[in-house]
Design a protein with these regions (language model features):
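A signal for specific C-terminal beta-sheet/loop modules enriched in small/flexible residues
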Residues: 56-60, 125-130
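IQ-motif-like calmodulin-binding regions
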Residues: 50
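Amphipathic alpha-helical binding modules
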Residues: 62-121
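N-terminal low-complexity, intrinsically disordered segments
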Residues: 1-45, 55, 61-88
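N-terminal leader regions
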Residues: 3-18, 108-110, 114-118, 124, ...
Length: 131
């Protein structure tokens, strides 16, 4: 699914609000928007499998980073895309239009009409910088 900078900003702002590290945010963004696998550790996090998440985690990952990610998932990720391995797998199998409909309903992306309107108006947009 192709997102305008306006919709991209909405999702990136949610990461910024939770202080999610860029190394965590990038795979989660790609999972939500494109249905790409976020990797074994983050798949386990999305599936609520703590033991697998920690055992598959990079040694440099920190508890505060995981806490920020967990808060972001709880507050941001649609229920259809988290909670079990089956839900994570089903999200990845959804077509772009179905994923977009869920993300629009969750307020994470704008409708294509709204994106077009903002683009035509030349509305300025500044994406948050993730660290």
């Amino acid at each position: 699914m192709k997102l305008s900078p306006y919709s991209r900003k909405i999702i990136l702002t949610t990461f910024n609000n939770w202080h999610v590290d860029k190394e965590f945010a990038d795979p989660m963004y790609n999972y939500l928007v494109f249905g790409y696998s976020p990797g074994s550790c983050f798949t386990a996090v999305l599936a609520n499998d703590f033991l697998s998440a920690v055992s598959r985690s990079h040694p440099g990952n920190t508890i505060p980073a995981f806490k920020a990610l967990a808060g972001w998932i709880r507050d941001t990720v649609p229920a259809q895309a988290r909670g079990s391995y089956e839900a994570v797998d089903q999200w990845a199998l959804l077509g772009a239009d179905a994923r977009r409909a869920v993300l629009e309903s969750a307020g994470l992306v704008l409708t294509e009409d709204r994106e077009m309107w903002l683009t035509l108006k030349g509305e300025p947009v500044v994406e948050p910088v993730l660290y």
